[in-house]
C-alpha cells in the first residue's frame, strides 16, 4: 500500500485515503536575466523638464500628485545626474558602462515612451514663474523618491516615527547642495495622499534605478539615496538575515548550514542558493531585482525561507539582539521546533569565542609558535552529552562542532533545557514586545513553562 495513505472505517466500511493539503500555487521567480536585455518600463511622452517641475511642485504644495506624471518626470530628470563610471560595470552579461564612461541612471535600464501627454501639458505650475536650477530639480527628485521610503515604513512603527523620518529627510533637501523648495511638513502631508505608492510598479522601478546608480557612482546629489535605499535587497529578508547570521557567529555559509538539523531546511537552502544568480556580485541587478520587476515572487523573502528565518532570529533573540526580538515570526514554519534548535545554537555561540595568537614580536617568535602548534597533539574527548549544564553554568559544551551540538540535542530528547528557557524568558520579558514578534512568541510560550 502507498506509504502516504491512511486506512480507517466509516460505518463499518473500510476507507483508504491520501491526505493532501493546500499547497503554494505561486512559483518563485529567480531574477537572473537570461536574454541580456536591460530591465524595461513604458511611460508617457517625455515632458518639458522645466514645465514638468513647475507642475509637480504645484501638485506637492496642494498634496495632489498624479503617479504617471511623477514617473514621467523622474525618468526625464535622470539626464541631470551625469557621473563617471569608476570601473567596467557588467551584470548578468549586460554591459552597463565601461570604466570612464559618462553615464546617468537612464543607462541602467530601458525606458520606452508613448505619445500620451502628461497633465502638465494641459495645466499646472502657473504659480511658479522662473525656470528651476539643477539643484531645485535635484531637491524635487529627492522629495518625490522619499515618498517611496515613507510608504515602506512598517505600520508597527507607532507614535511620531514616520513624521520624524519625513522631517529629517526634508532637512536634507533644504541644505546644500540642495535647496529648499517646500515648506516644513509638506513631505508628510503629501505622503498621506500617496501612502501606497511603493506598490506602483513604475514608481518602484524608478526608485530602484536611482538607488542602483547612486550606490555606485560618486555624485554631488548622492544623498537622493535617502529615499531609495530601501529598494536594495527588497523582499530579501531571508537571505539578508542569513548573511547577518553567519557574520554574527563568525562562520562561513557552508559551516553554518551544518548546524541546521531539520528536514524542512533542505528545500529552503536549495531555493536560497539557486545557481546562476548574482547574490555575491557588487552592484548587480540582483540587488534591486524586486524594484526592477525581475521577480514577481521573491525566493529570498522571509516567507520563502521561513524555517531558516525563524531559526536565525531565535538564535538572535537568545543573544539578546533587538532586531531579532522585533522581527515577525513566520507562524507557518515550525516556530516551536525552531525555538528549540535556536536555544541550542544560541547557547553554543553566545558568550564563547575561538581564539589564537596571530601577531608576534618578530619572525623568530612567529617561527617558534608555528613549530609548537605543528607538533601539538590535541586529545579531544567526544562530548557524550551527559554533563548537566543546567547545574554547571560554566560548562563549555565541548568542542564547537555540529556533531557535538546534535548529540546534546538528542541526549536531551529534542527539548530545551532549563538554562535555555531561563535565557529566552529573560530576554523576552525585558523587551517591549511587538505583536507577532519573536519576543512575544518566546514570552507567551516559555514564561509559564514549569521546567
Curated annotation (Swiss-Prot):
| Keywords assigned | Capsid protein, Helical capsid protein, Host cytoplasm, Phosphoprotein, Ribonucleoprotein, RNA-binding, Viral nucleoprotein, Virion
Task: State any single GO MF term.
Answer: RNA binding
Q: Where in the cell is it found?
A: Virion; Host cytoplasm
In this UniProt entry, the residues modified to Phosphoserine are: 389
Give the main location: virion
Q: Name one Pfam family in it.
A: Rhabdo_ncap
Task: Spell out the post-translational modification annotation for this entry.
Answer: Phosphorylated by host.
What does the annotation give as the result of altering residue 174 to A? In strain: Isolate Holland/9018/1987
Q: Which GO terms describe its cellular component?
A: helical viral capsid; host cell cytoplasm; ribonucleoprotein complex; viral nucleocapsid
Q: What is the effect of changing residue 44 to E?
A: In strain: Isolate Holland/9018/1987, Isolate Holland/9375/1993 and Isolate Holland/94112/1989
Function, as annotated: Encapsidates the genome, protecting it from nucleases. If expressed without protein P it binds non-specifically RNA and therefore can bind it's own mRNA. Interaction with protein P abolishes any non-specific RNA binding, and prevents phosphorylation. The soluble N-P complex encapsidates specifically the genomic RNA, with protein N protecting the genome like a pearl necklace. The encapsidated genomic RNA is termed the nucleocapsid (NC) and serves as template for viral transcription and replication. Protein N binds protein P in the NC through a different interaction, and can be phosphorylated.
Tell me, how does this one assemble? Homomultimerizes to form the nucleocapsid. Binds to viral genomic RNA.
Protein family per UniProt: Belongs to the lyssavirus nucleocapsid protein family.
| Protein name from the UniProt record | Nucleoprotein
The organism encoding this protein is European bat lyssavirus 2 (strain Human/Scotland/RV1333/2002) (EBLV2)
Amino acid at each position: 500500500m502507498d506509504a502516504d495513505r491512511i486506512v480507517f472505517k466509516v460505518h463499518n466500511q473500510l476507507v483508504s485515503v491520501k491526505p493532501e493539503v493546500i499547497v503554494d500555487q505561486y512559483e518563485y521567480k529567480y531574477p537572473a536575466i537570461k536574454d541580456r536585455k536591460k530591465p524595461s518600463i513604458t511611460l508617457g511622452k517625455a515632458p518639458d523638464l522645466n514645465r514638468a517641475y513647475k507642475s509637480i511642485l504645484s501638485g506637492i504644495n496642494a498634496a495632489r500628485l498624479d503617479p504617471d506624471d511623477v514617473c514621467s518626470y523622474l525618468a526625464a530628470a535622470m539626464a541631470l545626474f551625469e557621473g563617471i563610471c569608476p570601473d567596467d560595470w557588467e551584470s548578468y552579461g549586460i554591459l552597463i558602462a565601461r570604466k570612464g564612461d559618462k553615464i546617468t541612471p537612464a543607462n541602467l535600464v530601458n525606458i520606452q515612451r508613448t505619445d500620451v501627454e502628461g497633465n502638465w501639458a494641459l495645466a499646472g505650475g502657473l504659480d511658479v514663474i522662473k525656470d528651476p536650477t539643477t539643484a531645485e530639480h535635484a531637491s524635487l527628485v529627492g522629495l518625490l523618491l522619499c515618498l517611496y521610503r515613507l510608504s515602506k515604513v512598517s505600520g508597527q512603527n507607532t507614535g511620531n516615527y514616520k513624521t520624524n523620518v519625513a522631517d529629517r529627510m526634508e532637512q536634507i533637501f533644504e541644505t546644500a547642495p540642495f535647496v529648499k523648495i517646500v515648506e516644513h511638513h509638506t513631505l508628510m502631508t503629501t505622503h498621506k495622499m500617496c501612502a501606497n505608492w511603493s506598490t506602483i510598479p513604475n514608481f518602484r522601478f524608478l526608485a530602484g534605478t536611482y538607488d542602483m546608480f547612486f550606490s555606485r557612482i560618486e555624485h554631488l546629489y548622492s544623498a537622493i539615496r535617502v529615499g531609495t535605499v530601501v529598494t536594495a535587497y527588497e523582499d530579501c529578508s531571508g537571505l539578508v538575515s542569513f548573511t547577518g547570521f553567519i557574520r554574527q557567529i563568525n562562520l562561513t555559509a557552508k559551516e553554518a548550514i551544518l548546524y541546521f538539523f531539520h528536514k524542512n531546511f533542505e528545500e529552503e537552502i536549495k531555493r536560497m542558493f539557486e545557481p546562476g544568480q548574482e547574490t555575491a556580485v557588487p552592484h548587480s541587478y540582483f540587488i534591486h531585482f524586486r524594484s526592477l520587476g525581475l521577480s514577481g515572487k521573491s525566493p529570498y523573502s522571509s516567507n520563502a525561507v521561513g524555517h531558516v528565518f525563524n531559526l536565525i532570529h531565535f538564535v538572535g533573540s537568545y543573544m539578546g539582539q533587538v532586531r531579532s526580538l522585533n522581527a515577525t515570526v513566520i507562524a507557518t514554519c515550525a516556530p516551536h521546533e525552531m525555538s528549540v534548535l535556536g536555544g541550542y545554537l544560541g547557547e553554543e555561540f553566545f558568550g564563547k569565542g575561538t581564539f589564537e595568537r596571530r601577531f608576534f614580536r618578530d619572525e623568530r617568535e612567529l617561527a617558534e609558535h608555528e613549530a609548537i602548534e605543528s607538533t601539538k597533539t590535541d586529545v579531544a574527548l567526544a562530548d557524550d552529552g551527559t554533563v548537566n549544564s543546567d547545574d554547571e553554568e560554566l560548562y563549555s559544551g565541548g568542542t564547537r562542532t555540529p556533531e557535538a551540538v546534535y548529540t546534546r540535542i538528542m541526549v536531551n530528547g529534542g527539548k530545551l533545557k532549563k538554562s535555555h528557557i531561563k535565557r529566552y524568558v529573560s530576554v523576552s520579558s525585558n523587551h517591549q514586545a511587538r505583536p507577532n514578534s519573536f519576543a512575544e512568541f518566546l514570552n507567551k510560550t516559555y514564561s509559564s513553562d514549569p521546567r
